[in-house]
Amino acid sequence: MDTGKIVQIIGPVIDVKFEISFIPKINFALEIKIKNKKLIMEVMQQIGDGIVRCILMGSSDGLKRGLKVFNLNKGIEVPVGKPTLGRIMNVLGDPIDRKGKILSSEYRPIHNKSPSYNEISSSDELLETGIKIIDLICPFAKGGKIGLFGGAGVGKTVNMMELIRNIAIEHSGYSVFSGVGERTREGNDFYNEMISSNVIDKVSLVYGQMNEPPGNRLRVALTGLTLAEKFRDEGNDVLFFVDNIYRYTLAGTEVSALLGRIPSAVGYQPTLSEEMGILQERITSTKSGSITSVQAIYVPADDLTDPSPATTFVHLDATVVLSRQIASLGIYPAIDPLDSTSRQLDPLIVGEDHYLVARKIQSILQRYKDLKDIIAILGIDELSEEDKILVSRARKIQRFLSQPFFVAEIFTGFSGKYVTLKDTIDGFNSIINGEYDYIPEQAFYMTGNISDVLDKYKKFYS
């Protein structure tokens, strides 16, 4: 018989006893029917004697020992394809936007193997984001993996929202957003922002917010990835956004503790690298289409050496590091140009001009950072004339790296700006060469391209 009964309940961990010949496989979905609703759980361990240990995908309220459990003989499957666009679903693929059932003809299991070595395709093509500091210092590759690293409140979600808006409007591609263990309010704001930007019909949303059980939060990234894989397999270039990878790790830690595994460093699960690898290896481009992944990664206590962000680093092509120090100066996006890196910043990929301008910008900002202590102790007048000019240009560069976002217009009061890569390179090159040494640094703050700076200068300073 493909039915068992509950023998133990410990929070979201349920032990179910089956006849030994009918024991379900790992990752199979089991169903409990209770009070006109269905609860789904996933098999995590086979602990012997016909007993399997499962993790619930919902609340355990109302469960009791002896309840009948049905083996579905397959893993969790979710609807995929174009009917999911503009819709919000949960980890099980059920709609949570009160717009009725998602009418998809195809369902896919959330547990899939990553593409074989022969199917994988790589590309050096750049993905223009319209955000100056990203396009210049840490350019994104089409089909690459990008991490947005930052502590609490430095702008990871806002940067992600701007990226979705820019790429959906300027490149008209499909996006999939997985909200993993984040605030419900943020999910609501995000949904409304997508509607107001008129890009909601190009985005599929999968939410498993922080009040959900750990099993739900652990699997919601896989649900989103399954949707993205379908779009990729149809020949599309897809953007896959995950907010937040740290919560995915945290859910794994909770599940690991509930299953009785001995924790490793700093309390993380011993299977941290494996779980991260299973997710990240599926986020890849094939000969039919590409998945470009942007992942927000919370950094506990701003410590980049913490095992969770450190494990994620190895999978990424570009790292965008958000700095609390830069945010405190009022410069947004608060991206650190000295810490952020990209494998694409290579003269053979981006071109000689782009590469030289980016490296020159970094060297000027690094020199300014080194001089800050001298300026603080002795004052700027004690510097050589050459260093005084360098400091002046560095401060202009710092302010020119700020940019008004479309999704943050309500907060900044500035109209959003999309800046092309050519305008970005030309603008920074002209500052390096001293063409605008006569313009005060305030004119460079919260502007788009260099013509915006000149307009601001004429309006306020001439």
From Swiss-Prot:
**Reactions accelerated catalytically:** ATP + H2O + 4 H(+)(in) = ADP + phosphate + 5 H(+)(out)
Segment forming the signal sequence: none
The record's annotation in InterPro entries points to: ATP-synt_VA_C, ATP_synth_F1_bsu, ATPase_a/bsu_AS, ATPase_alpha/beta_chains, ATPase_F1/V1/A1_a/bsu_N, ATPase_F1/V1/A1_a/bsu_N_sf, ATPase_F1/V1/A1_a/bsu_nucl-bd, ATPase_F1/V1_b/a_C
Q: How does it sit in the membrane?
A: Peripheral membrane protein
Transmembrane regions:
none
Q: What is its EC number?
A: 7.1.2.2
Its annotated compartments are:
Cell membrane
Keywords of the record, alphabetical order, are: ATP synthesis, ATP-binding, Cell membrane, CF(1), Hydrogen ion transport, Ion transport, Membrane, Nucleotide-binding, Translocase, Transport
Q: Which HAMAP family match?
A: ATP_synth_beta_bact (MF_01347)
| Family, per entry | Belongs to the ATPase alpha/beta chains family.
Quaternary arrangement and interactors, per the entry?
Answer: F-type ATPases have 2 components, CF(1) - the catalytic core - and CF(0) - the membrane proton channel. CF(1) has five subunits: alpha(3), beta(3), gamma(1), delta(1), epsilon(1). CF(0) has three main subunits: a(1), b(2) and c(9-12). The alpha and beta chains form an alternating ring which encloses part of the gamma chain. CF(1) is attached to CF(0) by a central stalk formed by the gamma and epsilon chains, while a peripheral stalk is formed by the delta and b chains.
PANTHER family annotated for this entry?
ATP SYNTHASE, ATP SYNTHASE SUBUNIT BETA, MITOCHONDRIAL
Q: What is this protein called?
A: ATP synthase subunit beta
| The species this protein was found in | Wigglesworthia glossinidia brevipalpis
Q: Highest lineage ranks of the organism?
A: Bacteria, Pseudomonadati, Pseudomonadota, Gammaproteobacteria, Enterobacterales
